[in-house]
Amino acid sequence: LKINQKPFLLIFLFCLALSIPAYSQYGSLENKDAIRLTRQAIDSVYNLNFPAADKLIRQLEDELGDYPGVLLLKAFYMSWKYRPIKKDQQAFVDFENLLSQSTSVCDSILSLNKNDPEATFFKLTAHAYLAQLYSDNGMNMKALGEAKEAYGYVKSGFDLVDQNPEFYFPCGIYNYYREKYPEENPFYKSFIWFFRSGDMAEGIEMLKKGSKEALFDNVECYTYLFHIYLRYENKPALALPYAEYLKKKYPRNLIYTSHYIENSIRMNQYTGLEPLIEKLRSSELNFYKYLGEIHAGYYAEIVEKNYQKAIDHYKMADKLGNMDNVRIAHFDSILFYGMGRTYKKMGFDELAHSSLKQSIKSAEYKAYRTPAEKLLHE
């Protein structure tokens, strides 16, 4: 789960890697039962109900065999169940094999029709998943090779949106991130000049259309509309409806619980957050405990005004971040900003200065970096 700075191409493709198999042609759109089972399986995975997803995926395998959408659905399942997937695990081999098998089947389809929209989408997703897998495991050259492969299919996707609404997600992501990412990270401007231009407003509109029209990528459209509005556009009020939808639809998914808490804190709305924070803190997984302790620190600091209690939560989050390699830069920026702000309130200026510098170093978004910089220089 540890995220490092990566070139624009990989950053963009990691967003695509979340794409979910889209069943459109190749015989499955007419199969209403397959569509129903697929939607149920995806919802079960999002809700972290893996036993239910297992049963549904087996039914799809019995019905559709080695259909590439089923293979990618299994990869999607693994990406949630075993995250983070490390190269010394059997899950790494199984995940890699699923994706390689999927690309082989897609190649067979594309050999008959090089413009097949479904096979194009499946192959894009498989390459993006592999790019993420290799980069997360430090296999950067292999990751870049997969990323370059995927980019070719992204370009094709713009011509296929009218045929398959699942393309609203990858094309919307591309339109937005192609312009926004180098804006926030000027270093990469010279790296991406050869990519086709994007349009941030159009990208957001495509994601909104995808949230309504896509059968299988609509959840990712909701997720990235939340992410864009809260973290890039700095408009938490516009992000909140998407965070609320995901939390309510998938109550067992603690990532979405954390997103809702983060959004609410940004709006200074703390009512009802305490039981949600405790839900994170009581998880068996250190990653969710890490998130819960960060949010608990904010609650103790802002609502209870118990500064020592807040510091204790922040320190526990920092400790948990080192366990099982769960530390994430964005959440570290929130953690150390809260810690620095609390130390400043307590009169510990040196500790505040050190914490705020760590927050600035970790921050991935201007909306989170700027307040820490401002407080550091007060």
Identify the residue ranges that each predicted region occupies:
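TPR/TPR-like (Sel1-like) alpha-helical repeat modules
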Residues: 151, 155, 195-199, 204, ...
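Short coil/linker segments at helix-helix boundaries
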Residues: 34, 44, 48-54, 76-117, ...
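Solenoid-like repeat scaffolds
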Residues: 25-28, 59-65, 160, 192-197, ...
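"A position-specific structural signal for the A-helix of alpha-solenoid helical repeats
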Residues: 39, 73, 80, 122, ...
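Residue signature of alpha-solenoid helical repeat architecture, marking inter-repeat boundaries
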Residues: 31-32, 65, 70-72, 114, ...
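TPR alpha-solenoid repeat register
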Residues: 70, 119, 167, 220-221, ...
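Alpha-helical adaptor scaffolds
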Residues: 221-231, 258-268, 277-282, 288-328
